[in-house]
């Protein structure tokens, strides 16, 4: 058995699910809760995969490497599939109203997948986890994303 470290982070962002048979094909948003589960890669080298202090990783490291990635890249943004023609058109709209702040031109984040919670969780485990945790001896083993308190998806072991 291995020890696991779990931490969650809340973000708010929009998306639309291209090809969805119901209202999720429309522009909408969620207050997501993203749960990260990490394990040590060094179970053979360190006692039970724990460091000299007796932990897998400091919770602050999970926050700075994974939670803050979410905060900086997805929070309060619109996540759009790079194949979504509607989102591409919306991202090009220029607002000329004095009451709309246009100083942030990074409101749209284009990703190489249809932004379902399932695909978002897989992307975090397969792409972002290895990038952000590189050199730490820690692996992001699973992600659970709650779209609502009633509906969630998980990817990983």
Task: Specify the residue positions occupied by each region the protein language model found.
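Charge-rich, low-complexity N-terminal segments
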Residues: 1-157
């Amino acid at each position: 058995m291995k020890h696991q470290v779990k931490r969650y982070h809340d973000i708010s962002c929009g998306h639309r699910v291209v090809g969805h048979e119901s209202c999720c094909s429309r522009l909408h948003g969620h207050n997501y809760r993203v749960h990260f589960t990490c394990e040590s890669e060094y179970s053979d080298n360190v006692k039970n995969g724990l460091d000299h202090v007796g932990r897998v990783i400091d919770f602050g490291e999970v926050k700075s490497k994974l939670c803050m990635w979410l905060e900086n890249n997805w929070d309060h943004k619109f996540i759009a599939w790079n194949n979504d023609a509607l989102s591409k058109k919306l991202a090009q709209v220029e607002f000329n109203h004095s009451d709309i702040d246009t100083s942030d031109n990074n409101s749209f984040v284009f990703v190489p997948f249809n932004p379902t919670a399932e695909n978002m969780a897989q992307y975090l485990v397969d792409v972002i986890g290895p990038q952000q945790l590189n050199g730490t001896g820690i692996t992001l083993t699973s992600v659970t994303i709650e779209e609502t308190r009633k509906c969630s998806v998980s990817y990983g072991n």
